[in-house]
UniProtKB/Swiss-Prot annotation:
The modification O-(pantetheine 4'-phosphoryl)serine is found at residues 677, 1326. Pathway: Siderophore biosynthesis. This is Nonribosomal peptide synthetase SIDD. Residues 65-81 have a biased composition (Low complexity). Keywords: Ligase, Phosphopantetheine, Phosphoprotein, Repeat, Virulence. Belongs to the NRP synthetase family. It comes from Beauveria bassiana (strain ARSEF 2860) (White muscardine disease fungus). GO terms for molecular function: ligase activity; phosphopantetheine binding.
């Protein structure tokens, strides 16, 4: 038994099973929280993670109800059995329950305080909004507790808490307990009315909230004091009670948790401190909580699991990992991964949808809230320790734990309690072992009772049942208090005392995992309906549908139906109430308590006792048609029966497709009854079976039964003509030649080729993408099988299925002159075997699926240790899609169940290929050219700059409920229309273009819905948004457009974009729409007898997100009540807050479009309440916006709709800039719009508004970004570029050669580069210019960096470049003549420095070497900064020593890794260089070979995470001597020797004397390639070649330039007259919006010019000199970008201001000096000072600096350009992640002005670094810098100095 002694080890203490959350909640705010607590959970414990979760939960409820019926039927039989309760039964029951666990009379917050004393600096809370150590948590909670005491909080008081997920919740929770009060956690996402009811029941006079929820707190607790807690709360001293905190009795109330109540209001469960602690401590021992536990905090605060998540973790000394609300609900796997949590608890449904790497990364996975299947348990326990548990809220959080799931998947044994099973009708009667009974819980975990409900408490909290006081045999009777759970359970057969859950005995049900009293649902519905309506809520399982909560209604005045039907139409009064019930009911209860449908009956069925016959209602529910579940009632027009033969056949087909037996009338609408595009496709097939011919277009254009029947044609049911093998070959390519050609490409025999036909455009695109990224579009699926025999059976089924399905045997090859072709191969399948799933998956990912290889493969993995056999299938998306995969699985299942009886399909994939080949390409070209002619070029979201490569990195979700749909309009049409309206306001245009990915199965091919193969396709959708059009007209136009594009939807984006310049622009799709129609039926539960079912992903919509190539992908999953939208987006293009508002607008617009077809689009309100709030904030600060300063006399600036200023523009959307000023302007005037007047504060100016003619938008911070002139930007540009001219293509040979080089360097397609495009506008800078020059040399082209800056466009640059061969595209000869990096002769650079090289080597160099056996191959002098960094390596502080931490997430071959490290050293001479000293000068000695140290460390302390442990090793290492003559390179490897597959870390130590930020990424890539065996490391240029070139060529050639530039100059000093008493660093920073800058000026020039201007103004000088950090590589050396060594330099920049200069003049001057000095930047400052006769040595040094002043600048400006700053974080070859550590801080020598580019070049961070003593001076300097930069950006034409 675990004690609670005061021990330093911080071992296991308090525990609970904490849920991890859900990845795909339909309605995020009401999503339930999973826990390790079974179906009897009091306050909801399964999660609405996805459809699967809902199905399983509902199925469990249904089973519970069936069990109740069985109990009634077997009552007599069981009564007889109970009377036969044997002595043996009693012996066994009392043996299990003889000892009641001890009551632990302690408070959990006291235990946490003890932990804080033991581990003050350990992190207690790691949250999205910051972290807290135990010391900080203890201090803050104590301060807040004292403040609460002052406000009257005391023992006996209950304090509600209202917080979003935050670190401050934990602080508040502890503070309330320390103050002596009880807390009651609430979830702010629940309805306000419900929260108010909860608070009222607590009688609270004070409420504690977060700052964000303070306004909500005031609403739900009117009259109460609201204390908002945030960082600001503690920034100033809190008023506190002078009395000490009380000693809180353990018997006092700790918390109240609210659950569903049968009276219509939530009921509060009261738990004492000793209740909680007595359960928490034994749970800790059972589960394994430790001080190293990192517990993921998912649960909603409305559920008591969240209490355990915080308090039990802290009581163990562990770490609470708090995700953001968005991360918790929208990116579960990513949040768990980012938090590095090692303990997660959830429902099985949620665990199934986690990314594959999550579960293996955990130490503990807790499952509960749902029945855990044997297959789930078998799957997950092979990766982690699996726990199952259960517990109702009335007995704290959990009271059973099963920690041995290999024996059983039940809910386990009691912890902190004992458990009895009694007769459900009489708790004084025990039931025999093995029989079903009601579970009673006895022990200290049994709570106080229900708040304010003594009668209810007495009913279920009982005392002294007769069998307990009587005892048995040697077991003495006892008094006891027990809780009646209402859960039906039984003891398992293994006689271990473990318990199996069976069901419920009452009307309590589980909905989306929540415990719900049906009577509470009924109560709230009743309040929303007219009087006289009988209401019964039930969970039903309709035919072919998921378990669903519905409400049955019966009116007293109902007259019944004339045909005797059970169902009747509601009265007008009831109908009106039902039309708005979702809204009225949603204001009262959480969304999971709102029924999916309201079914009106002629009368409510009753039993003989006149009680409602719920069994009968459930039977009725089975027959309820699907159409009744999507709406409260339907309007189908006149109910005329089908008359013609076609109508009758079609009606039958409708019923089949809609899975409904409801009558279909002539006027019925297919879409009105639940049809959609998916079902339309299926209807084509169903109609064909009836002998009727239809197309999808026919169905959309003729949605009513009569119209559709009239359109149909009579056809034969015979299948279409079979496509013969090789009949689809291109002309001139015969079968024999084709077989030979493709067989050679596949590496097979010609006779093994069964067929060949072309690829689809989709397949071409997918193969092209995966050729660039090895793992792109490849999926792995794992199926865990029960035994090897099952595996063999599944293998045989797969083999048989592949014989019947050509797509499973298809490969893709690139045939010269014929393109990509698919080859059907007829050969025996091969498979792989293994013994470890994780190892195989890693190995399999390394095996590419290339052209000519198999694109489906499988393996059988037998893991004897885990006792499992797994079937692993790997497949390429070029051969399957989300539609075809279930068809493949169906074929495998057929072979599995009925071997030798193959499944027959009407068509194969080649039938679809034949259809594509038969299409008239000219017609498709004509269609798309017309569709996209004149399309608006601006798309949402906007590119930050031309050439930007999008990458989605964020995910948001929103559920959009739809109460109704316009007749004959589909949800898909509504979604397209709504998004078009939203997007239009963000681009300031009514012409909207976005992409849509379609199923592609609208093609008129027989059996198209059964074709096994990928048919998805993406098209550009152009939607004109006409404000004068009615909603109905708008929807109809979009629907007609989508139908009209069906014949052309497979033309392919890559082909559409080539049709015209407009088409090319339109196909630059930024946003993509993916629609997932609702399925016909509920997805079946996984059938254990059909293991292939596990190959289908549970969430098809979420699967689509893995293949997102858009900047914004909207995946919409439709259901009968609305649709769920998941937005995956690039946060650099659209920030998260803007995207969140856009989704709110999307939801609002969709709902408005659904409500009325006669509303004008111009009257559809696109802005949400959040938009209004955001605008209110920006309007309130409009007078302070920097843009105001750019207009003389302006008092404020706003953004208005450019087409209609009476309407608001949301934050992030484009509009026209309007200024407010009292000075008349020569601009268009504008009355103050009413919306603006309403938002303006009383103090706002009332001056007139003037339209400036400039387009602008509010950025994420609420500041105005000016995009440019309206005239030049409208309809022609992105926000980041000047007006785009028609692109002129390259025509000459030299232009095309240069364009190819641009494309490679800038990573921009050649088709996007025109003659008039500027290299720098497309993303180029000085570094990429240098790379271009280097790349051009092997191609026979000579270009200098200076030429590039002077001739920026492709046409200009091509005209000045020199070509060695202009007559041929071949560049072999030119390449042969291209210069290579010169290799210096050994020791030649010592000429002039030493008299005798041999003597110098023997007497100076070798004696200093650490190892006398080393052979020196060269010695060369060090460069200036290299020498400084050597000295900063050999002496303390060693600020030049860098530790690169490389974390491996999987198993590592240590021998291979060690060899790779040594090979990297051998590959780069700079790494095998050691340093020696002579005559105060440092020399570099290059060794022939060097075995660098490689030390191994055992990571055996799990109390410290790997990163911290490794960094401690590094800090110890840096203190060791690193003398001259020794290797600065060293390797440290940290791993757990007992867990070779666990995470490990390699540390690469080096000195800054050996690298700079340009060559280090190259070295890391080389290391990765060396470890991968099969890759040749990319070459690098030796540093000696660079030094030789610089010293022999660059320095002599450059000194005259510097001498002339700097003649008569002095280094500008900038030193406050303030003593330096504190030499610590002070860094002050501010972000500046530069989006309106002149784009032809590089990002490097702007901050340099800014500093020059600021320095000139501050010092009142017109001639300033300061230092810049440059790459040092612009030296004309071939391959300079690949030099392995430290080339960076400090160089001077001199600006002599002309009094007449404007900002444009300064920017041009600085850029020109950059161009001119680029070729001279290798010269060091020391060389300039010593050789140019500048007289700088007379200047004073910086205070405390003993070096010559001429060797250093007083101020340095550093542009941290993006591609130098950034490098890849993840190494795909070794699955690694990088982290950098500098152990020692660099002493400050000068003022530093640093800039960091952000937001794709639209903003920069300006940072000033100086001494702490000068910090205040630095703040003033930064303000001046910001002012100067804003002038250069916004007013570049303004003079710099007044006359």
């Amino acid at each position: 038994m675990l004690s609670i002694d005061d021990h330093g080890g911080g071992g296991p203490l308090a525990v609970d099973i904490i849920p991890a959350g859900s990845g795909a909640q339909k309605t995020a705010p009401d999503a339930a929280d999973p826990s390790l607590h079974g179906p009897g959970r009091a306050n909801g414990d399964a999660v609405n993670a996805d459809a699967t979760a809902a199905e399983e939960t509902g199925s469990r409820d249904d089973e519970s109800q069936q069990q109740q019926q069985q109990q009634q039927q077997q009552q007599q039989q069981q009564q007889q059995q109970r009377s036969l309760l044997s002595e043996r039964d009693l012996d066994q029951l009392w043996q299990w329950n003889a000892v009641v666990p001890e009551t632990i009379q302690r408070c959990i917050h006291d235990i946490i305080s003890e932990q804080a004393a033991q581990r003050p600096q350990d992190v207690a809370v790691q949250s999205w909004d910051g972290s807290l150590t135990y010391s900080e948590l203890e201090h803050l909670s104590t301060q807040l507790a004292l403040h609460l005491r002052l406000l009257g909080v005391d023992i006996g008081v209950t304090v509600p808490l209202c917080f979003e997920k935050s670190k401050w919740t934990v602080v508040a929770l502890l503070a309330v307990m320390k103050a002596g009060a009880a807390f009651s956690l609430t979830d702010p996402s629940q309805p306000e009315a419900r929260l108010q009811t909860i608070v009222e029941q607590t009688g609270a006079k004070l409420l504690v909230t977060s700052a964000l929820q303070s306004s909500l707190g005031a609403k739900i607790a009117p009259g109460a004091t609201v204390v908002a807690v945030s960082q600001a709360t503690f920034d100033t001293p809190l008023q506190q009670s002078s009395d000490p905190l009380p000693d809180v009795p353990s018997s006092s109330l700790m918390y109240v948790i609210f659950t569903s109540g049968s009276t219509g209001k939530p009921k509060g469960v009261s738990i004492s401190h000793e209740n909680f602690t007595s359960g928490a401590i034994p749970r800790a021992e059972a589960v394994g909580y430790k001080s190293t536990s990192r517990v993921f905090d998912f649960p909603s605060y409305a559920f008591d699991v969240s209490i355990d998540c915080m308090l039990c973790t802290l009581a163990c000394g562990g770490q609470v990992c708090v995700p953001s609300e968005q991360g918790r609900m929208n990116d579960l796997s990513g949040s768990i991964r980012d938090s590095k949590a090692n303990m997660v608890h959830m429902t099985p449904s949620v665990a199934r949808v986690l990314d594959s790497d999550i579960i293996p990364s955990l130490d503990v996975l807790g499952l509960g809230g749902e029945v855990v299947s044997g297959s789930d348990a078998a799957t997950w326990r092979q990766f982690t320790h699996l726990i199952i548990g259960y517990g109702p809220s009335e007995c704290t959080v959990g009271c059973t734990v099963n920690n041995n799931t290999s024996l059983s998947t039940g809910i386990g044994k009691g912890v902190g309690c004992v458990m009895w099973l009694v007769d459900p009708e009489d708790h004084n009667v025990l039931v025999p072992v093995g029989e079903v009974g009601e579970l009673l819980i006895e022990g200290p975990v049994v709570g106080i009772g229900y708040l304010g409900e003594p009668a209810k408490t007495a009913e279920v909290f009982i005392e002294d049942p007769t069998w307990l006081t009587a005892g048995h045999g040697c077991y003495a009777g006892r008094h006891g208090r027990l809780y009646k759970t209402g859960d039906l359970v039984r003891y398992e057969d293994n006689l271990s005392g473990s318990i199996e859950f069976v069901g419920r005995k009452d009307q309590q049900v589980k909905i989306r995992g929540q415990r719900v009293e049906l009577t509470e649902v009924e109560h709230h519905i009743q309040t929303c309906l007219p009087t006289g309506v009988k209401v019964v809520a039930e969970v039903i399982k309709p035919e072919n549908a998921s378990p669903t909560l519905v409400a049955f209604l019966a009116e007293k005045s109902s007259v019944g139906s004339q045909d005797g039907s059970l169902f009747v139409d509601p009265s007008p009064e009831l109908s009106a109430a039902l039309d708005k019930i979702d809204t009225t009911l949603g204001a009262k209860v959480p969304k999971y308590m709102i029924p999916a449908a309201f079914i009106t009956l002629a009368s409510m069925p009753t039993m003989v006792s006149m009680k409602t016959d719920r069994k009968k209602l459930r039977e009725i529910g089975i027959s309820i048609p699907r159409s009744k579940l999507g709406a409260t009632h339907a309007d189908e027009g006149p109910q005329e029966e089908p008359e013609t033969d076609a109508e009758k056949k079609l009606a039958h087909a409708w019923q089949l497709v809609l899975a409904s037996s409801s009558p279909v009338y002539k006027a019925s609408s297919f879409f009105g009854l639940g049809g959609d595009s998916l079902r339309a496709m299926k209807l084509v097939s169903a109609a064909r079976e009836q002998g009727l011919g239809l197309t999808v277009a026919d169905i959309f254009n003729n949605p009513t039964l009569s119209a559709m029947a009239n359109k149909s044609t009579s056809i034969s049911s015979a299948t279409q003509e079979q496509v013969k093998p090789f009949s689809l070959l291109q002309e001139g390519w015969d079968e024999q030649t084709a077989r030979k050609d493709v067989a050679e490409l596949c590496g097979i025999e010609p006779e093994q080729v069964e067929d060949v036909y072309p690829c689809t455009p989709l397949q071409e695109g997918l193969m092209a993408l995966s050729s660039k990224v090895k793992e792109a579009y490849i999926a792995q699926r794992v199926v865990v099988l029960k035994d090897l025999e099952t595996a063999k059976r599944l293998m045989a089924a797969y083999d048989e299925a592949s014989r019947g399905s050509p797509i499973l045997r298809t490969r893709i090859v690139q045939v010269p002159r014929r393109g990509l072709m698919q080859v059907v191969v007829n050969r025996k399948l091969e498979y792989t075997t293994g013994n470890n799933v994780a190892a195989y998956l890693a190995s399999d990912r390394e095996t590419p699926m290339d052209l000519g290889t198999a694109l489906w493969r499988y393996a059988i993995i037998t893991d004897e240790a885990a006792g499992t056999v797994s079937f692993v299938l790997t497949m390429h998306h070029a051969l399957y899609d989300g539609w075809s995969m279930p068809l493949v699985v169906e074929r495998i299942n057929q072979a599995y169940q009925h071997p030798g009886k193959p499944l027959s399909r009407p068509s194969e994939f080649k039938d679809f290929i034949k259809y594509l080949l038969s299409q008239d390409a000219a017609e498709s070209e004509k269609y798309w050219r017309a569709q996209l002619e004149g399309a608006h070029r601006l798309q949402f979201p906007l590119l930050p700059h031309q050439g930007y490569q999008t990458a989605a990195d964020e995910l948001l979700e929103e559920y959009v409920p739809l109460e109704q749909l316009p007749k004959n309009a589909t949800v898909a049409t509504l979604i397209r229309a709504a998004w078009a309206i939203v997007a239009s306001q963000y681009i300031n245009s009514t012409d909207v273009v976005f992409g849509e990915t379609l199923t592609g199965r609208n093609a008129p091919v027989v059996g198209v819905d059964e074709i096994e193969g990928p048919m998805i396709t993406t098209v550009p959708l152009r939607v004109p948004v006409d404000a004068e059009a009615q909603v109905g007209e708008f929807l109809q136009a979009i629907q007609e457009q989508t139908v009209g594009q069906i014949p052309h939807e497979h033309f392919g984006l890559q082909h559409i974009r080539r049709l015209s310049p407009d088409a090319r622009e339109a196909c630059e799709l930024r946003a993509g729409l993916v629609l997932h129609p609702s399925a016909d039926t509920a997805a079946p539960e996984v059938d254990a007898t059909l293991p292939a079912n596990n190959l289908i992903p549970h969430l098809a919509a979420r699967e689509a997100l893995k293949f997102n190539t858009f900047a914004l992908m909207l995946v919409c999953s439709m259901d009968p009540k609305g649709f769920q939208v998941m937005a995956s987006f690039d946060s650099k293009m659209v920030d998260k807050s803007t995207m969140r508002r856009a989704l709110a607008q999307f939801k609002s617009v969709a709902q408005q479009l659904a409500q009325s077809t006669t509303t004008l689009l111009g009257n559809v309100r696109a802005l949400s309440d959040d938009d209004a709030a955001a605008l209110r904030d920006v309007v309130a600060t409009a007078q302070e916006d920097p843009v105001v300063k750019t207009y003389d006399g302006a008092s404020a600036a706003y953004i208005v709709r450019s087409d209609d200023a009476s309407k608001m523009v949301p934050v992030g959307a484009i509009g026209e800039l309007a200024i407010q000023t009292s000075q008349p302007k020569d601009l268009s005037t504008l009355p103050v719009p009413s919306w603006l007047a309403a938002l303006l504060p009383p103090s706002a100016p009332t001056d007139a508004l003037y339209l400036t003619g400039k387009l602008a938008r509010y950025d994420a911070a609420g500041k105005i970004q000016v995009l440019g002139d309206k005239a030049s930007l409208t309809a022609s540009t992105d926000a980041s570029a000047a007006a785009r001219k028609p692109r002129v293509s390259a025509t000459s040979q030299r232009q095309r050669r240069l364009r190819a080089l641009w494309s490679h360097v800038l990573r921009t397609p050649e088709t996007e580069i025109g003659l008039d495009d500027s290299f720098f506008l497309l993303g180029g800078d000085s570094i990429s210019a240098m790379k271009l020059a280097s790349e051009a040399r092997p191609e026979g082209i000579r270009l200098t960096v200076a030429q590039m800056f002077s001739h920026k466009t492709l046409a200009e640059m091509a005209a000045v470049m020199e070509c060695t061969d202009e007559s041929s595209d071949s560049t072999a000869a030119a390449a042969a003549e291209a210069p290579i990096a010169p290799i210096a002769e050994p020791f030649e650079l010592l000429d002039g420095l030493v008299d005798d090289k041999s003597a110098f080597l023997a007497n100076v160099v070798k004696p200093q070497l650490q190892d006398a056996s080393w052979t020196v191959s060269n010695v060369l002098p060090t460069r200036f900064l290299q020498e400084l960094t050597v000295r900063a390596t050999i002496s303390k502080p060693r600020f030049a020593v860098r530790y690169e931490l490389i974390f491996f997430d999987g198993p590592v071959d240590l021998r291979r890794l060690r060899q790779s490290c040594q090979r990297l050293v051998a590959h780069n001479e700079i790494l095998r260089t050691v340093y020696v000293e002579s005559a105060d000068r440092i020399y570099a000695a290059v060794l022939d070979a060097l075995e660098t140290p490689f030390e191994e460390f055992a990571y055996t302390n799990p109390a410290v995470d790997l990163s911290t442990f490794t960094k401690d090793i590094c800090r110890a290492d840096v203190d060791k001597p690193q003398p001259l003559g020794s290797s600065f390179v060293k390797w440290l490897y940290v791993a757990d020797p007992q867990r070779p597959a666990a995470r490990s870390c390699l540390v690469f130590r080096m000195s800054h004397a050996q690298y700079d930020e340009m060559c280090l990424p190259i070295m890391l890539r080389q290391l990765s390639a060396l470890y991968a065996h099969d890759k040749t490391p990319e070459p690098s240029v030796p540093f000696s070649a660079y030094v030789s070139h610089v010293m022999r060529t660059a320095v002599p050639a450059s000194l005259p330039y510097w001498r002339e530039l700097l003649a008569g100059s002095t280094i500008t000093s900038f030193r406050p007259d303030i003593p330096i008493t504190d030499r610590r660093h002070a860094a002050i920073a501010q972000t500046v919006d530069i989006s309106a800058r002149t784009r032809d000026v590089t990002l490097a020039s702007l901050p340099t010019a800014t500093w020059a201007l600021c320095l000139a103004r501050r010092r009142a000088l017109r001639d300033v000199v300061f230092g810049e950090v440059v790459s040092g590589r612009n030296v004309g050396l071939p391959g300079a970008e690949s030099i392995a060594g430290p080339c960076w330099q400090y160089v001077p920049l001199r600006v002599r201001f002309d009094p007449s200069w404007t900002g444009n003049d300064l920017l041009a001057f600085v850029q020109q000096q950059h161009v001119e000095s680029a070729g001279h930047e290798a010269v060091s400052l020391r060389e300039i000072a010593e050789n140019c006769g500048l007289g700088w040595e007379k200047q004073a040094s910086m205070p405390g600096d003993d070096r010559p002043a001429q060797w250093w600048f007083d101020t340095v400006c550093h542009q941290d350009v993006s591609h130098v700053k950034e490098r890849e974080n993840t190494d795909e070859e070794a699955q690694t992640k990088y982290e950098t550590l500098y152990t020692d801080e660099e002493p400050l020598r000068e003022w530093k002005v640093q800039t960091y580019v952000r937001d794709g070049g639209n903003s920069v961070v300006l940072e000033v670094v100086t001494f702490k003593s000068w910090e205040e001076h630095g703040k003033g300097l930064l303000a001046d810098l910001v002012k100067a930069m804003e002038q250069l950006v916004h007013r570049p034409g303004e003079k710099l100095f007044s006359d």
